Amino acid sequence: MYHGVYEGAAADAQEKKILILGESHHDLDSSITTQEVVEDYLSPENTTKQSLQFFHKIALAFGVDTGKVEEKARLWDKVFFGNYINKSLDGPSGEGDETAQTLIATNRDRYNQDLVDFIKAHAIETVFCFSDRVFDALPNEEGHGSWTLFQDVKCGKADLWFGRGYGPDSPFCRELKVYGVPHPRYWNRAGIKPEELAQYIRPIFEDCCG
């Protein structure tokens, strides 16, 4: 996964380990590691930095009071975070979307293998995937160790909340639940509010991490 994975201070100590999965870096120096990006977001002076709003929206979707530094830290201390696409993409201008589609189409097997290796190595049980494009690229063959968790929840015409389960016969070789939501950059356009997502995400997070 791109430039390593952010590991919260207590992520590996959780009884049920969580990975938050993003799509790719945007508007960031490609030399910056994922660990540095999240730590930059957690710095009090950088909470309004435009390039870090992705993390701000994720925190809101977990029901976090982002005005409290200690609440933000409590979330990010307990999770892993990584990006699916192995490249830094330019900002939300349109080129990034086209590039992402092309990269996933041509590198899906490699990206999935990187993800499988990480999930197996860290015994991840729950993934929150903040990109429907990435969610659709994950191993998804019905009847081969995976299944749909529930009927998709809609927000207007957009899918708001969707999920897939995996078992020992899947490429992940373990019980795994992957929950998907659209990428945060589309929320305003689709009329999606973080508090709508929090009603689904927060109970699962609390069950995993308390």
Regions found by a protein language model. Give the residues of each.
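Surface-exposed cleft-lining segments at the edges of enzyme active sites
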Residues: 35-53, 85-109
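Proline-aspartate-enriched helix->loop->beta-strand connector
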Residues: 113-132
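C-terminal capping/extension of enzyme domains
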Residues: 99-112, 116, 139-210
